[in-house]
Structure formats: C-alpha cells, structure tokens
C-alpha cells in the first residue's frame, strides 16, 4: 500500500485560525493531500490521506513548527485516498462540547493510561468505562463492558452524565474515544464536575489497537472512522461482529446513510436489504421524492412502488 491516513490533534494556541486555515489549505493542496482539518484558537484536529511521501512531508512540515513539534500522528496504511476533497476550516472549538465554562486540557484533564494500563482497567470491576463517542460509533464496535451513552452528538454527553451520575458514584471513571481528543476535554470536564478519580485512554482506540502487547484485546466489532473507509479493525486477537442489520437484526458491519437527503441517518444494513428497502431507513424515507438510491440506480416508478411493499412485509414480521 502506497497511501497513508493520518489522524492527529494538538491543543495549542493558534492566534489567527482564519489565516492559519487559509495558509494550511494551500499547503495541503500543493502536496495533493485530502482530508478534513479543524483549527481554532485552542489548536488543531485533523484526519488526512495521501501517498507515503506526501504524508511524510506533511508530518515533517508540522513538526518543524514550534506549536506542533511534539504532535503525535496515528498512521494507517491505505490503498488510496480516504477522502474525496481537502477542507481546512476555522472553528470555535476543535471538538464541539459547547460548555458554558470551557475546559483547557493543557491545564485540566484526566490521568493518561497506556494501552496496558487501560486493559487492566477493563478487567477491574470497580472501574467504570465510559465510551465518549456517539451511539452509532458504539453500535459498530466498543470495548467489552463499556457504558453506552445514548447520544448522537458529543456536546450532549455532559447532560447525559448529569442525568446518570448515580451510575458512577464512588467509582474510578475511565473514558475512551477514537484518537483521544474528545477525552482530553471530556475527562477535564468530569474533574470540574467533582469526579475525583478520572482517567483516559491515551491516544484512543486507534493507539490501543496497534499496541504490540494489548493487540486490541477486549475490543468487540470494528472502530468507526470519519472518512471513506467507514470502519477499521482493532482486535488482533479475536474477531467479533456486534453490529446488527437495521432491518433483520443479523450480524452486520456495513454502514450507509439513509437515501432520504433530509434524513441522512446512518444505519447498518446488508447490500441485500439496501436494495430491498431502497437504501432508506423507513417507509417514509423510501418514498421521499428525492430518494438518492432511486435516482442513482435509475429505478422506474413502477419498480419503486413495488419495492415499497417490502415495508409492508417488514411490519408483518416485526
């Protein structure tokens, strides 16, 4: 494989995010990179892809900047680009937690756990493991025994914690996310909320899966990623599928977006059921006049109406 996908972040001061984003986009395009990068006054959060040569040049360029000299890059080999375009966008935050009283992870954050230390935490009955990701990420794969917050956006996590605080009373709390950036701020928020014993998986799931000692042990399913790959393997010890098809509940690890552009819900679905149910999550979405699956596959009105009856069969067997 001649391509690489880079996942990285750094909490650091960027005085002029708008100008930085403009200059950074020009640099990335000049080096034929593709991806999505967020920048703010609090730092940078990015995922991008390119050839090994191009990504090595990018990492060298970033490490030459005093602000990013010790930034850690998580690297995956790939067969091609993981993105279709290159975006660098200035934002208020590099992860959207939207706190009234913001947390600076450079000053307040949970204890860092190495992959080996995190594995011990997974084995400890007195430790609560919280998945800091969204529900659709959890449903594709997660650490065994982890708590699933019922959220679709990271910014909803603090409210969920407040509503379920009794679950964590007098327990050690350990949190994890994809690459570590969400936990840097979330674990700091937990400390400010009065939780005394708070830790986080340093480097996230991505680092844990590559650790030569843990080898991704106790991870079930696949890890959701925010690029064209959709998911990647983590557990090198054993293979399990925990995702379930949206329609029939059978084991499934294939995510699609609902074909209704006004819905766009992410669902796990087999190719067979995607065809059967017109790429939609519901009857209402399947019959939507701008159904993308219908348009992309040039399905006639008669065939469209015929396949809509599949939802009748679905309800009869529910």
From Swiss-Prot:
EC number(s) given by UniProt: 1.14.-.-
One Pfam match: Rhodanese
Catalytic activity from the UniProt record: uridine(34) in tRNA + AH2 + O2 = 5-hydroxyuridine(34) in tRNA + A + H2O
Coiled coil: none
An example Gene Ontology biological process: tRNA modification
Matches recorded under Gene3D superfamilies: 3.30.70.100, Rhodanese-like domain
HAMAP family from the UniProt entry: TrhO
Its biological purpose: Catalyzes oxygen-dependent 5-hydroxyuridine (ho5U) modification at position 34 in tRNAs.
Name of this chain's protein: tRNA uridine(34) hydroxylase
């Amino acid at each position: 494989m001649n391509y690489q996908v880079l996942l990285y972040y750094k909490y650091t001061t960027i005085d002029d995010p708008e100008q930085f984003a403009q200059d950074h986009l020009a640099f990335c395009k000049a080096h034929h990179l593709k991806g999505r990068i967020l920048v703010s006054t609090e730092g940078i959060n990015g995922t991008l892809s390119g050839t090994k040569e191009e990504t090595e040049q990018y990492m060298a360029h970033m490490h030459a900047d005093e602000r990013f000299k010790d930034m850690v890059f998580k690297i995956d080999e790939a067969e091609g680009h993981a993105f279709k375009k290159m975006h660098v966008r200035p934002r208020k935050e590099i992860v959207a937690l939207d706190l009234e009283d913001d947390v600076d992870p450079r000053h307040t954050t949970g204890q860092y756990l190495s992959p080996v230390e995190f594995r011990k935490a997974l084995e400890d009955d007195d430790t609560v493991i919280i998945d800091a990701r969204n529900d659709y990420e959890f449903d594709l794969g997660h650490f065994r025994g982890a708590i699933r917050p019922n959220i679709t956006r990271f910014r909803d996590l603090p409210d969920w914690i407040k509503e379920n605080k009794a679950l964590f009373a007098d327990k050690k709390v350990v949190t994890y996310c994809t690459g570590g950036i969400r936990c840097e701020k979330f674990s700091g928020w937990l400390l400010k909320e009065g939780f005394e014993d708070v830790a986080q998986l340093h480097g996230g799931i991505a680092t844990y899966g590559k650790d030569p000692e843990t080898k991704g042990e106790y991870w079930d399913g696949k890890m959701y990623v925010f690029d064209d790959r959709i998911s990647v393997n983590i557990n090198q010890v054993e293979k399990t599928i925990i995702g379930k098809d949206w329609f029939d509940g059978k084991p499934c690890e294939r995510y699609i977006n609902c074909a209704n552009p006004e819905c766009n819900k992410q669902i796990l679905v087999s190719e067979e059921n995607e065809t059967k149910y017109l790429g939609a999550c519901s009857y209402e979405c399947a019959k939507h006049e701008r159904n993308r699956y219908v348009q992309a596959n040039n399905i006639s009105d008669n065939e469209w109406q015929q396949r809509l009856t599949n939802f009748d069969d679905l309800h009869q067997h529910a």
